[in-house]
Each structure stands twice: as C-alpha cells, then as structure tokens.
C-alpha cells in the first residue's frame, strides 16, 4: 500500500490516531469500504499506550480483570492495558495481584485452544478479550466459546475499532467506531453494493495487514 493513500484521523489524546484508506477491500468474512491500518498501534509503544489509556477510560474501577486474551497480534496493547489496570488499582483475583496477558493458539480449523500449562490463567478467571477490531464478530465468538469451554468468565470485549457496543451479551468498548469514518460500511460478500456496481476489489485485508490485488 502506498503511504500517500493513507489518511490519518487524529484525536485530542496524544498519539491516539487512526490510519485508514477508502476503497473496496475483502476480509475473510466481509467486504468493507475502509482499510484500517493498525500496524503502528500494535507495534509502536507510544501508540499502544494511547490505545490502552483510551480503553481504560471505559471501565469502572470495580471491573474485575484477571487475564487479557490478545487476538490479532494485540500483545503490545494488551501489555500496556495490563499495566494501566494494575497501576490504577483495578481489581483482580489473582494471588500475585497482577494480570495475565495471553495469546491464543489456533488449530488448523481456526479453533482456539489452550494447553494444560495455560489453562490456569483461564479457568475460573475473568478474561478480557482484546482484538484489533470487532466487526463481523467471528473472532470474538471463537474467543468467547474457548474461554467458556475452559471454565473462564468473559469480562468484556475491547478493540481499537468496533462497529457494535454489545456482542453475544457482552459489552464491547473501542477507541474508534464508525462515527469516526464517514460512510463506513461492511457487507457479506454476496450482498456487497460495491461488487454489484462492478467496483473492483483493491486488496485483501486481515489482522496482519493489506495485500494489493492490482
């Protein structure tokens, strides 16, 4: 992707910004008219901290979070969020009074599993799901099912960008939402209005980034 095609959306909070490109893009489950580039938020410490601080503002000090499950390569943000939660005296039930930060393992069928040595950080714990985005909900659903299966409790869902404020009965909070992106839309591939107009796909996107098609 050419950097000149990227638009930066700034906010009042230092280092809290969003980089986007308008166009016609395909994910594994939908077609979207914005590519949201979260590379820097996931890898640059200053921006990861800004996302963590923004997400923290949505939670009450009575929120209990024992474990943060990081999806979509969100480990740096998850670590920053754990630090913010700990330094702001949020409750957790862990005997060591700190927070687990985990990344899931996926089977070949994209199912989330936890090995025996990781299960103690899930079973009986209040687990916050942290994703890059919550749009179709497929990734969040897989995490919810895994946490429940292994005996954990979902404490909520957080993301850099989300199109919903509730998913499967769990609160979703995000640093950015469609109000920040004029005309944002997401459609099932067979219902995509851009495809029906004959607009060519510009690229494939996933949690790793963007692959240009032409």
Residue ranges, per PLM feature:
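Active-site-facing substrate-recognition patch
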Residues: 1-64, 207-214
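PRPP-dependent phosphoribosyltransferase catalytic core
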Residues: 2-9, 144-214
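Short, well-ordered alpha-helices that flank and scaffold nucleotide-derived cofactor binding pockets
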Residues: 57, 83, 87, 145, ...
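Short amphipathic alpha-helix with an adjacent loop that forms part of the alpha/beta core around
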Residues: 59-61, 115-121, 189
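Short glycine-rich phosphate-binding loop at a beta-alpha junction
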Residues: 63-74
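Conserved acidic residues
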Residues: 66, 125, 155
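Hydrophobic Val/Ile/Leu positions in short beta-strands of Rossmann-like dinucleotide-binding domains
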Residues: 70, 129-130
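Short, glycine/charge-rich flexible loops or terminal/linker lids adjacent to PRPP-binding catalytic cores
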Residues: 78-128, 135-139
């Amino acid at each position: 992707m050419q950097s000149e095609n990227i638009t930066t959306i700034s906010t009042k909070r230092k280092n809290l910004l969003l980089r986007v490109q308008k166009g016609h893009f395909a994910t594994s489950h939908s077609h979207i008219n914005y590519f949201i580039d979260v590379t820097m938020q996931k890898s640059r410490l200053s921006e990861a901290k800004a996302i963590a601080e923004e997400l923290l503002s949505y939670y009450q000090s009575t929120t209990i979070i024992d474990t943060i499950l990081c999806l979509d390569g969100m480990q740096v943000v998850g670590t920053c969020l754990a630090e913010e939660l700990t330094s702001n005296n949020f409750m957790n039930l862990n005997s060591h009074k700190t927070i687990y930060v985990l990344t899931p393992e996926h089977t070949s069928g994209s199912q989330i599993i936890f090995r025996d040595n990781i299960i103690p950080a899930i079973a009986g714990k209040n687990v916050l799901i942290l994703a890059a985005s919550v749009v179709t909900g497929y990734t969040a659903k897989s995490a919810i099912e895994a946490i429940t299966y292994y005996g954990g409790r979902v404490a909520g869902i957080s993301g850099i960008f989300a199109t919903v404020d509730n998913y499967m009965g769990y609160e979703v909070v995000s640093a950015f939402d469609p109000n920040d992106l004029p005309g944002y839309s997401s459609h099932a591939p067979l219902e995509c209005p851009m495809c029906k107009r004959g607009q060519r796909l510009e690229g494939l996107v996933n949690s790793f980034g963007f692959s240009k098609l032409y």
